[in-house]
């Protein structure tokens, strides 16, 4: 059985020392780089775009898991492929033609993910669940790092795992927002496959050790 994936969120890195933080993730037990792209429209915050992606593409030695919190994401599918994205996740709430969007992501040679805001029902995925590689469950309201974890996420993950099994989907369940050393084990038990961790990693005294702890499977 595959071990769970830990994906530090670059949004929480020190952008004055970005290359240092990239090297830290490279040297750690982390599996992916999680990259949040925000446009100030779909979410209130603006993060970063292609220049930062190009830096990550140049120095990162692990896959780039790019999470688009932007309106009409299909406009940029090829551009994100060119910037190094290996997985491209779009929000179901922001994509007018989700099936076509997923097809275009896969045609460009990337893995396709769909993200759900905290209020969004998992059954909106029924008709697309077998076409995607990842479901990103937002466990905070999207747009800002460092928010408090929404407790209902556990029940949502359990229900989503059941749906994936019923539909015979191989999609991974990714949790994004408020993941820490106190809740990560319960998330794994609930059915999570990928843990996105921002402040928990980058605000800790020893980020490499924190990542190591997040990789542990408690008995």
Task: Kindly label every feature range from the protein language model.
Residues 1-89, 94-97, 104-107, 111-112, ...:
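Conserved N-terminal beta1-alpha1 strand-loop-helix module at the mouth
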Residues 34, 174-175:
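Generic enzyme active-site microenvironment
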Residues 119-121, 180:
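Short acidic loop-to-helix transition motifs that present clustered carboxylates
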Residues 140-142:
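Short glycine-rich anion-binding loops that position phosphate/pyrophosphate groups of nucleotides
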Residues 175-179, 196-200:
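Glycine-rich beta-strand-to-loop/alpha-helix junction loops that act as flexible
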Residues 178-190:
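Acidic, divalent-metal-coordinating active-site segment for phosphoryl/phosphodiester hydrolysis
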């Amino acid at each position: 059985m595959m071990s769970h994936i830990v994906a530090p969120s670059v949004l929480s890195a020190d952008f004055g020392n970005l290359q240092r933080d990239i090297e830290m993730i490279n040297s750690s037990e982390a599996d992916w780089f999680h990259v949040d792209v925000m446009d100030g429209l779909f979410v209130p915050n603006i993060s970063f775009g292609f220049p930062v992606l190009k830096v990550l593409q140049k120095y990162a030695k692990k896959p780039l898991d790019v999470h688009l919190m932007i309106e009409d994401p299909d406009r940029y599918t090829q551009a994100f492929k060119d910037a190094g994205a290996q997985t491209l996740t779009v929000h179901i709430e922001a994509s007018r033609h989700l099936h076509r969007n997923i097809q275009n992501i896969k045609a460009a040679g990337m893995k396709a993910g769909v993200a759900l805001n905290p209020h969004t029902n998992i059954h909106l995925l029924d008709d697309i669940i077998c076409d995607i590689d990842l479901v990103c469950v937002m466990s905070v309201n999207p747009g800002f790092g460092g928010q408090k974890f929404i407790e209902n996420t556990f029940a949502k993950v359990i229900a989503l795992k059941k749906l994936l099994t019923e539909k015979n989907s191989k999609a991974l369940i990714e949790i994004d927002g408020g993941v820490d050393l106190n809740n990560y084990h319960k998330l794994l038990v609930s059915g999570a496959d990928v843990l996105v961790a921002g402040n928990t990693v980058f605000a800790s005294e020893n980020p490499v050790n924190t990542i190591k702890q997040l990789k542990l499977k408690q008995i």
